[in-house]
Every structure is written in C-alpha cells, then in structure tokens.
Amino acid sequence: MRYREIILSIPKEIAENFTSFLDEVGVVGYYEILFDREVPRAPDEEIISDDTKFRVYLAEEDKENETKILIFLKATAGESFFLESRWIETKEYEEAYKEFYKPFIIGSYRVIPTWEKDTALGTTPEGIFPLLVNPGLAFGTGHHETTRLVLGRMGDLNLSAKRIADVGTGSGILSLAAAKSGASLILAIDVDPNSVRSASFNRDENEISSEVLVVEEGGFDHKKIQEQTWDLLIANITFAVLKANIQKIASIKTDHFLFSGVITERKEEFLELLKNTVGGEGVFFREDTGWELIEWKRKG
C-alpha cells in the first residue's frame, strides 16, 4: 500500500487551526516536527524560525484532501507556506518519523523511542524515569512544547498514590510519566482509536499493569471520567476543544487541573472561561515559544 506524504512549513500562528482542520477532514496521520536533540532550548536561546513544520499522510485512495489542504493554506497563510508531496510505501511511512525522534530528557523523565531502548535505557541517568514511547499515528512524541511543558510540571508534583485522568492521551506519554511517578490509577482516554492502540502498546512496552494504567476510547463525557473522583485531570488539548467542552470539564470531580495546548493569544480568554465556568484560580503558569501551561485549582 502507498501513502501520500505532504511535507509542510507553515506560519506558527496558524498551526493550531491547521491541526483542527486536519482532524476535521480526516487524514491517515500527521505530526509536527520540532526539536530533535537531547538538551531542551535554553530560556535565552534564539528561536531559529517562526514557522512550524508538519508531515501529513493521506491514504492512496484519498483524491481530495491534498487539494483541501492547499486551499486551506492559501486562504489562511497566503503565500507564506511551503508544501511538497510524494508517494511513499507503507514501510517508508512507518519509518518516516523515526528520523526526527531521538531520546531526550525533560524534567524527571527521559523519553526514549522504543526502537532505541536497547542502547538508551542503559545510559539513562540515575533518578530519571525512562519513558519508552512509539507514537505510531498518535500525537505525543514528547518533542512538542505542550507535552514538554506538562512533563516538566509533572516532575515537580507529588503524584504518588494519586488517581489521574489523562484526556486526549495520544501516545499515552503523560500517563506513562504518571505511572512511573507512582500514581495508583491512571485513566487514559482519547477519541482517536489509533491513540488508544498506541497508548496501550506503550503501556505494555513500559511493563505497566493494565490495572494501574487503563486505556479507553472517549472524551470529556466518558462515563468513568465523569462519575469517578480524580486527584488530577491532565488535558493537553487545543484551545478550541477545551472551549467546546468547558461545561463537561467543569462537571468532572476534581479540584486540580493541568492544561496545555493553549496558545498565548488565547490564554486570557481561556482563563476567563475557567474562572466563570469551572471556578477557582490559576496556581502555576509557564510559557514555551507561544504555548501555555496552566495549572488550575478549584480550592485555594
């Protein structure tokens, strides 16, 4: 089987809308190319480019979506984007993202691609939790700023014996981190069946019990999410999805939230939504190249 690989470079300010568009039209998969190095960017280090790079994959029989993508970019970015495409075989598709995905440390965790575990596990520093991850078609390599922000904060929190809900789990990377940090129960859910399969695979790769890390399909209205009580809710999801589900978020039985996936331009609007609908206040904030981490508590 063949796939159509579309290589893109687009203005960063339209990246969130672009991913929402891809989710809406339905593509085989996509991922965002960001950092590819062991050491995170220093606070005063120059950002080389304001563009965001994507690779998008279409099924061989998909005759429409490449044109739709081009029309979307013309309408939103004008001439300020680069696009090229090619046919690739299944094996190339499965291997493509590995070129850009290497082990790296963020906070208390070292993210290790599953295909590098034989060499990388032995070099992980003492006191650092290794997270074996194969993202497959799911979001969550750990390279994206939003995932880095959440991992960095999770390392500062006491998660031992906590009950944690991870909505929009993607590859399951944040749930893996919670399990390695001693959480007693993690419910990882995602509306994308590919993510459910990916998170389940990564759980097993890390030898985490399915009784500790439960992976299921669903969203904020998932029965277990709504009916059970949680010590922490993690949602690394775009602002548009968070806004659309704010009432469901407010009804979840937890007083502690970690949100990421919100761009700086939408931060104040999201904080106002939280204040008016969820109640409580922000207790910790961190920004990374235009993406925001918001830790929110209903009780001060």
UniProtKB/Swiss-Prot annotation:
Species assigned in the record: Leptospira interrogans serogroup Icterohaemorrhagiae serovar Lai (strain 56601)
Native organism taxonomy: Bacteria, Pseudomonadati, Spirochaetota, Spirochaetia, Leptospirales
Biological process (GO), any one: methylation
Family: Belongs to the methyltransferase superfamily. PrmA family.
MF GO annotations: protein methyltransferase activity; protein-lysine N-methyltransferase activity
Gene that produces this protein: prmA
Primary location: cytoplasm
SUPFAM superfamilies (UniProt xref): S-adenosyl-L-methionine-dependent methyltransferases
Record-level GO cellular component terms: cytoplasm
Full protein name: Ribosomal protein L11 methyltransferase
Assigned keywords, A-Z: Cytoplasm, Methyltransferase, S-adenosyl-L-methionine, Transferase
